[in-house]
């Protein structure tokens, strides 16, 4: 998982990226999990830079390009590797010309992580670093989208559990490219409540990254 984190940091460091977020409610059809509605798609552009000791802190700006009604809405995120520092996020509402600080789910034990651009992604889902706040277990070696992967479980420790809506996540990590291809997220009753699928994995500046994420 440290290799995955390092790759994620490298893709955002002093780099300009375009990405597509797709979100939908999922259901079961023909014994397969699939979208139960038309996906809501947002096209984003982002730029970031890593700071701090070993370059493990980061600052990132993300701007919505599509749909047109949301163009110009932006998000500024500061992520810290230090477990004693909470990550910080601000949202710029272009239609109102206002900046709003949004909850990360870290600064207040009772706060729900905020939605990212009105999608099923939350600030918790986009957090990086702080792997020491999790118990990490390799559950299996399998395949995902035709790729050999490790199936890795992350369970938050007592401190992190107070800030998380997930009791655990299961990550399918590409063995060769160190990209997470799928994440299953479970609630306190061990019910899967969300699933992330990554696609359009491309080599950018010698780093593999997913250009499309569906939640």
Which residues are covered by each model-predicted region?
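N-terminal mature ectodomain segment of secretory-pathway/periplasmic proteins
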Residues: 1-95
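Intrinsically disordered/low-complexity terminal segments and short unstructured peptides
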Residues: 61, 141-142, 168
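A short, polar/charged loop/turn motif at coil->beta-strand junctions and beta-hairpin connectors
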Residues: 11, 56, 130, 146-148
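Short, surface-exposed, charge-dense and proline/glycine-enriched linear segments
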Residues: 45-52, 61-62, 104-108, 132-137, ...
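Short amphipathic beta-strand and strand-loop transition segments with alternating hydrophobic
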Residues: 6, 43-52, 135-143, 199-201
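Surface-exposed beta-loop interaction hotspot
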Residues: 118-137, 141-142
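A generic signature of intrinsically disordered, low-complexity regions enriched in glycine/proline
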Residues: 6, 21, 129-131, 161, ...
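Gly/Pro-enriched, hydrophobic low-complexity segments
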Residues: 65, 76, 87-92, 98-127, ...
């Amino acid at each position: 998982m440290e290799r995955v984190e390092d790759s994620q940091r490298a893709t955002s460091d002093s780099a300009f990226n375009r990405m597509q977020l797709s979100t939908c409610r999922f259901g079961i059809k023909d014994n397969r999990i699939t979208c139960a509605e038309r996906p809501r798609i947002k096209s984003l552009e982002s730029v970031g830079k890593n700071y701090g000791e070993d370059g493990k802190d980061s600052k990132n700006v993300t701007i919505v390009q599509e749909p047109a009604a949301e163009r110009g809405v932006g998000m500024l995120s500061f992520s810290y590797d230090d477990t004693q520092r909470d990550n910080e996020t601000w949202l710029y509402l272009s239609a109102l010309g206002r900046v709003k600080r949004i909850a990360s789910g870290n600064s207040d034990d009772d706060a729900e992580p905020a939605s990212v651009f009105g999608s099923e992604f939350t600030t918790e889902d986009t957090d990086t670093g702080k792997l020491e706040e999790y118990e990490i277990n390799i559950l299996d070696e399998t395949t995902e989208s035709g790729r050999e992967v490790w199936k890795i479980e992350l369970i938050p420790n007592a401190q992190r559990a107070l800030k998380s809506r997930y009791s655990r996540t299961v990550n399918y990590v590409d063995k060769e490219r160190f990209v997470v291809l799928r994440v299953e997220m479970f609630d306190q009753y061990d019910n899967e409540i969300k699933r992330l699928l990554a696609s359009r994995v491309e080599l950018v500046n010698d780093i593999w990254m997913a250009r499309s994420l569906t939640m």
